[in-house]
UniProtKB/Swiss-Prot annotation:
The gene is ftsL. Pfam families: FtsL. The keyword Flavoprotein does not apply. GO terms for cellular component: cell division site; plasma membrane. This is Cell division protein FtsL. The keyword DNA-binding does not apply. Residues 25-89 are periplasmic. Belongs to the FtsL family. It is found in: Cell inner membrane. It is a single-pass type II membrane protein. Residues 33-73 form a coiled coil. GO terms for biological process: FtsZ-dependent cytokinesis. Its main location: membrane. HAMAP family: FtsL.
Amino acid sequence: MAMNKLNFLLLLAVCVSAFSVVMQQNQYRLNFTALDKAKKQEIALEQDYAQMRLQQARLANHEAIRAAAEKQNLHPPVSGNTFMVEHQR
C-alpha cells in the first residue's frame, strides 16, 4: 500500500514537472515571437527614419528651394509690396 502511494506521488511529480516544462517552452516561443516582431518593426522604423532624413536633406537644399520658387514664380518681397496690419481694439 505504501508503494502505491509513493508511485502515485512520483507520477504526480513527473506530470507536474512535464506540464511545467511544456508551459516554459510555450512561454519561450511566445517571447521569441514577440522579440522577432519587435526587431522587424525596429528595422522598418529605422528605414523610415533614414528615408525621412534624406527627404529633409533634399528639401533643405538651397538649390531645390530656389528651383521650387522659380517654378511657382515667387519673388522676394520688396518694400512696395509689403504692408503692416495692425490690430484695433
